[in-house]
From Swiss-Prot:
Gene3D superfamilies: 1.10.8.50, 30s ribosomal protein s13, domain 2. Residues 97-118 are annotated as: Disordered. It comes from the Bacteria. It comes from Buchnera aphidicola subsp. Schizaphis graminum (strain Sg). This is Small ribosomal subunit protein uS13.
Length: 118
């Protein structure tokens, strides 16, 4: 099993799809990585040679992925909360941040409904 960026890449999938199992790499970035490594997008990971997998590793290392990206994301949210700006307050109260309506909807952000006790 090929290991790239600390993640076991599924070998039975095509290179384009297999790279998307890494957090921070979607289809577009996966396509760019395959192009830079001169690897056909439809070639399976199990068919690749060790040198080609090493090229993939080098290309993936150029991007912020996995733990570093998650840490960066949480620190950005924490920074907004510490600044007490509007977006930080919305994050703190678990409400939609980008101006969506909250009279109805916004259930994903707010969580399940709270029962009204009489």
């Amino acid at each position: 099993m090929a290991r790239i960026a600390g993640i076991n890449i599924p070998e039975h999938k095509h290179a384009l799809i297999a790279l998307t199992s890494i957090y921070g790499i979607g289809k577009k970035r996966s396509k760019i990585i395959c192009f830079n490594a001169n690897i056909a997008e439809n070639s399976k990971i199990s068919d690749l040679k060790e040198e080609e997998i090493e090229l993939l590793r080098e290309n993936v290392a150029k991007y912020v992925t996995e733990g570093d990206l998650r840490r960066e994301k949480t620190l950005n949210i924490k920074r907004l909360i510490d600044l007490n700006c509007y977006r930080g307050l919305r994050h703190r109260r678990s409400l939609p941040v980008r101006g969506q309506r909250t009279k109805t909807n916004a259930r994903t952000c707010k969580g399940p409904r709270k029962a009204i006790k009489k």
